[in-house]
């Protein structure tokens, strides 16, 4: 019997989830925190977090804290938002405090958020640093320079999505921008079937064929937006 039954989280009415050390180890895919987020979880407590899992939580706007935060909440204390965000760089704080990467990006595009100015002075840069500096969003001057450790946003030239992530991406963009959303420069964005290409004829996948077909259908819907 499963220790954690299907739909136990989404039907449980939970708002917080509590774990031990290195929460998310082995769960680097975005799906792990996405399942928690869209099951109603808004506060994630752990003794420590695996780095990729922590980053994915940040991008979803999930507040994270340790067990001392949990004890204070159990004692009825009010905790200021800054206690959850102050340890991060200025841009990460903005992402968290505005509800995640998509709400943040929408507000940034609408001019509701101003990015911190780059303060790195002129310096020799590697080829990668030069590319990043050229692509930096919100450059405050010509000849912008970057250095290791700078927190910046940079525009990308292209991207991709496969059928294990497309359904979620489509849902998130639709929720944020509406049914008629579009992505910038779609000709540079690839959409392809990868993980489930041969799943129909794999016996262990047979109990999940209906869900697999849903993922494939959502892939086609997303393609029409790209």
Spans of features found by a protein language model:
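Fe-S-dependent hydro-lyases/dehydratases of central metabolism
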Residues: 1-226
């Amino acid at each position: 019997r499963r220790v954690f039954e299907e739909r136990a989280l989404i039907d449980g009415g939970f708002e917080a989830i509590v774990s031990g050390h290195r929460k998310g180890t082995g769960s680097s895919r975005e799906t792990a925190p996405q399942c928690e987020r869209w099951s109603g979880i808004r506060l994630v407590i752990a003794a420590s977090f695996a780095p990729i899992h922590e980053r994915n939580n940040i991008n979803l706007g999930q507040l994270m804290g340790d067990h001392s935060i949990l004890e204070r909440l159990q004692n009825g204390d009010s905790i200021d938002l800054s206690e959850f965000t102050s340890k991060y760089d200025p841009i990460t704080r903005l992402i968290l405090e505005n509800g995640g990467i998509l709400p943040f990006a929408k507000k940034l595009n609408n001019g509701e958020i101003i990015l911190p100015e780059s303060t790195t002075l002129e310096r020799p840069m590697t080829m990668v640093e030069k590319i990043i500096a050229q692509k930096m969003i919100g450059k405050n001057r010509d000849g912008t320079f970057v250095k290791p450790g700078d927190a910046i946003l940079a525009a990308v030239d292209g991207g991709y999505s496969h059928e294990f992530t497309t359904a979620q991406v489509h849902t998130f963009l639709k929720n944020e921008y509406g049914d008629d959303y579009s992505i910038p420069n779609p000709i540079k964005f690839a959409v392809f079937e990868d993980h489930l290409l041969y799943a129909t004829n794999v016996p262990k996948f047979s109990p999940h064929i209906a869900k697999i077909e849903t993922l494939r259908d959502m892939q086609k819907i997303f393609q029409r937006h790209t």
